[in-house]
From Swiss-Prot:
The lineage of its organism: Bacteria, Pseudomonadati, Pseudomonadota, Gammaproteobacteria, Enterobacterales. Coiled coil: none annotated. Homodimer. The keyword Manganese does not apply. Transmembrane segments: none annotated. GO terms for molecular function: 4 iron, 4 sulfur cluster binding; iron ion binding. This is Fe/S biogenesis protein NfuA. Binds 1 [4Fe-4S] cluster per subunit. The cluster is presumably bound at the interface of two monomers. GO terms for biological process: iron-sulfur cluster assembly; protein maturation.
Length: 191
């Protein structure tokens, strides 16, 4: 669980008073389990909360954390450091860089974890998601988009410029990715 000091809670409450009613706080990790993991804090609006978020109730507000990121935020502490005339919000997350993949995990499971921890949080901002459907013997991943990504006019750019580049950087075993989604453009499509 994320621990938030009383002074940090007061700081957040002061900030939240200036936001739209129902706004809370999100604690997140970018690139969890890697040497370049970065933790952060942001506003979390009602519409941003998904079924994959876990709510931690504080005094008068809620801190949301994306469920797959919880192991990386274990024993995390948010506090305010005051030095002379300055104060700074600090987030200490000792496990953000720790890799939780078990060495003998099969490749499919590692790719699914990578998608859930690194790709899907970005896609969820647009109401979208991507799932691994198959790994071919020739080294390609077949992916299926859903939600806001289904029918989105930017899906090929997302696939090649975003997802494929990240997967190839993380997994040397693969040659590329391709989309097997039967795209149906509709109100659910982001673009």
């Amino acid at each position: 669980m994320v621990s938030v000091s009383q002074s940090a809670q007061n700081y957040f409450l002061n900030l939240l008073k200036k936001q739209k009613y129902g706004t809370n706080i999100r604690v997140y990790v970018k690139y969890p389990g890697t040497p370049v993991a970065k933790c952060g804090v942001s506003y979390c609006y009602k519409d941003d909360v998904t079924r994959l978020d876990v709510a931690f109730t504080m005094n008068k507000f809620i801190v949301y954390v994306y469920k797959p990121h919880i192991p990386y935020l274990r024993e995390s502490k948010i506090d305010i450091n005051v030095e002379e005339c300055n104060s700074q919000l600090t987030l200490i997350a000792p496990y953000a860089n720790k890799c939780y993949f078990i060495k003998n995990n099969d490749l499919k499971r590692r790719v699914e974890n990578f998608l859930n921890l690194n790709i899907n949080p970005q896609l969820s901002a647009h109401g979208g998601k991507v799932d691994l459907m198959n790994i071919t013997e020739s080294g390609y991943l077949s992916l299926k988009f859903s939600g806001g990504c289904n029918g989105c006019s930017m899906v090929q750019k997302t696939l090649k410029e975003g997802i494929e580049k990240q997967i190839l950087a993380k997994f040397s075993e693969f040659k590329g990715v391709y989309d097997i989604t039967q795209h149906n453009r509709g109100n659910h499509s982001y673009y």
